């Protein structure tokens, strides 16, 4: 798609094709634009992950408050049976999830994180880090470079863990996630 989140007709067509092909899960990035324009209106998400909020897209939203309000739409409309997973280290995360009716799970480096990130180490081949969840440490590595990718992977880890996936499947998925062309890509 040319858009981060496709137009609703295109998105529903893709999701239907995936369903007909036997797909049980879909993972997608839901942009603030798509929330404001109701591209995902009517979809019921089992999980939503909030990674961070920085002053972007103000040309579209007009100001930071409108941008924050757009981001909140996904969380405010989650079904009670869903889970909201959020980066507790982000200054705006509490504002984003405060009105969310679903279960809430935090990730980050703060001591009160439910999925606590520690020991982040980056080099040109990727990022390694540890997540502590329910008093168990999980040593993880991704080929994606940067502390922010440890945070992104922690959100994915939390989602997968809460979905009931096996630890080795989660670790393998994080380890084999390919680089996205043009996104903090290492060039040789």
Where are these regions (language model features)?
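Conserved helix/coil segment N-terminal to the catalytic DExD/H
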Residues: 34-41
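Conserved nucleotide-sensing/catalytic segment adjacent to the nucleotide-binding pocket
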Residues: 2-31
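Acidic, Mg2+-coordinating active-site environments of NTP-dependent enzymes
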Residues: 19-23, 27, 45-188
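Short hydrophobic/charged patches on amphipathic alpha-helices used for structural packing
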Residues: 15-16, 37, 72
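Short, flexible, glycine-rich and Lys/Arg-enriched loop motifs at helix boundaries
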Residues: 1-2, 42
């Amino acid at each position: 798609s040319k858009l981060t989140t496709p137009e609703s007709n295109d998105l529903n067509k893709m999701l239907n094709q995936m369903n007909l092909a036997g797909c049980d899960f879909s993972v997608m990035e839901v942009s603030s634009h798509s929330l404001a324009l109701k591209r995902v209106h009517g979809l019921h998400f089992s999980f939503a992950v909030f990674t961070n909020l920085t002053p972007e897209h103000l040309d579209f939203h007009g100001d930071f408050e409108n941008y924050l309000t757009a981001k909140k739409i996904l969380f405010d409309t989650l079904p009670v049976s869903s889970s909201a997973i959020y980066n507790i280290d982000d200054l705006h995360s509490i504002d984003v999830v405060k009105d969310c009716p679903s279960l809430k799970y935090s990730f980050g480096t703060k001591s009160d994180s439910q999925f606590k990130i520690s020991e982040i180490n980056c080099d040109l081949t990727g990022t390694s880090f540890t997540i502590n969840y329910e008093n168990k440490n999980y040593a993880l590595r991704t080929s994606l470079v940067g502390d922010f990718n440890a945070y992104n992977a922690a959100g994915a880890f939390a989602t997968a863990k809460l979905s009931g996936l096996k630890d080795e499947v989660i670790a393998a998925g994080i380890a084999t996630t390919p680089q996205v062309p043009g996104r903090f890509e290492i060039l040789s």
